[in-house]
């Protein structure tokens, strides 16, 4: 349902962020990312990433946080963002709206990405071995992540549909939209929802590093593989930063190495 108050708030926040003086400086490389996790996690990750880019490219790089997936796509379309970490769906949306934009990099795991379905332990539902078992989620309170998330909504809904489960089959004939993968974990763990779907990497990271956040959860099913996250850049960066800049930018990103201590801190490589 359209919410005018939220739309106006989002619009005003977008205006205040994208009207900052940094956006009038053509020599600043502006980096963005879809907000698929808690903001403090994203801020740490992409500020470190921006510092690494700045160091290796010898240009000023600024990370610009956005409030939602739509803002990331909009910021890229209006050229207020130069380089954005998109998911599969949001990346397609951004490129369709931004002529000459290009995909410049992708992690190896993103070629074979997966989502997971999780359930609250109180349901006492056993994990399933094939897609047909998703029918067990009918009549439950179910939440996706963001509506524009590939791993948190698009692909999970696709697999649900393949199993004959539609949104109308959930309790209340609707699904929730938590806004992010971390929020999905929190909502199902608390019992606010019975089940949910999210990014497999975020799930595994929380299992390892935040066991309290997953204490009431069970893994229900892991999806088949699909293509997801990638870096998308504006097609005119060389007009601002010089000939060969895009190739150099691509090389820096692709040469990030998890085995290097300084690069390992950029959890973007493996999360």
Please report, for each region that a protein language model flagged, where it lies by residue.
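Short helix-initiation/N-cap motifs at beta->coil->alpha
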Residues: 63-74, 87-89, 168-186, 227
